[in-house]
């Protein structure tokens, strides 16, 4: 299946999304891009994975009681994404603005499949998604990403560590297994969906320059078409 199966980008705005394993630095890069675009005078909107108020309370309660199965977890995230698509993503795109998304459908494709969901089924669930202008994949080697997360957090959460899958009782070991499976899914999606790979081991400034160059190419192309 290719990305042409998804909603074609028929809106005047631009949608740039970042993806990657935990600890890849994607959120840092998106925040820098957001600040820069605002400073350049662009109308910019931001949307973050799993942030819809529609499902926040349900998600919190279910996580606390460890009630999620891989399928229910997947469907709740899809509900969150559908709400944000209609509320936070499509309206700005219709108005010609720039939307930056911290994680997009590829997060579901990677995490849900890593948890054992059927690959084709997960892709079918998100067929309504708008095709992004560019999907950046910040790729960090597994050991680098793991070290960044483990060294910066006192304790890994149950679902974050993949402990619900019962691969092992050790949180750090489980997290490593989980993130390894996620990275495998991202790597296979590069060709499938045309993800733009950024080397997340480079200096932050160099990654940002590369990201801005790609974004500006699309914005300048839009300006030329308008002229």
Locate the predicted segments by residue:
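NTP-dependent small-molecule kinase module
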Residues: 2-9, 34, 150-227
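Walker A (P-loop) phosphate-binding motif
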Residues: 8-35
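Hydrophobic "anchor" residues on beta-strands that sit immediately upstream
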Residues: 15-18, 98, 135
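Conserved RecA-like P-loop NTPase ATPase core
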Residues: 22, 100, 136, 186
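ATP-dependent small-molecule kinase phosphotransfer cores
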Residues: 40-130
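Hydrophobic residues at beta-strand termini and immediately following loops
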Residues: 47, 138, 198
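Conserved nucleotide-binding/hydrolysis micro-motifs of P-loop NTPases
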Residues: 51-53, 105-106, 140-146, 203-204
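A glycine- and Lys/Arg-enriched "phosphate-lid" helix/loop adjacent to the NTP-binding pocket
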Residues: 108-181
């Amino acid at each position: 299946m290719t990305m042409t199966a998804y909603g074609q980008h028929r809106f005047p705005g631009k949608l740039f999304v970042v993806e990657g394993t935990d600890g890849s630095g994607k959120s840092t890069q998106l925040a820098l891009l957001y600040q820069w675009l605002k400073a350049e005078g662009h109308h910019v909107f931001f949307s973050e994975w799993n942030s819809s108020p529609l499902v926040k309370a349900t998600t919190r309660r279910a996580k606390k009681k460890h009630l999620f199965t891989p399928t229910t977890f997947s469907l709740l995230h899809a509900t969150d994404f559908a709400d944000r698509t209609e509320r936070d993503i499509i309206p700005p795109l219709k108005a010609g603005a720039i939307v930056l998304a911290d994680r997009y459908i590829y997060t579901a494709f990677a995490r849900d499949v890593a948890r054992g969901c059927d690959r084709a089924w997960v892709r079918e669930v998100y067929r309504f998604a708008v095709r992004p202008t560019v999907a950046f994949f910040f790729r960090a080697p597994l050991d680098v990403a793991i070290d960044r997360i483990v060294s910066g957090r006192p304790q890994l959460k149950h679902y974050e560590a993949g402990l619900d899958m019962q691969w092992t009782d050790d949180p750090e070991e489980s997290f490593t297994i989980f993130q390894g499976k996620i990275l495998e899914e991202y790597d296979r999606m590069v060709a499938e969906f045309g993800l733009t790979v950024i080397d997340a081991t480079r200096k932050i400034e160099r990654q940002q320059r590369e990201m801005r160059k790609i974004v500006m190419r699309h914005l300048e192309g839009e300006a030329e078409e308008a002229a």
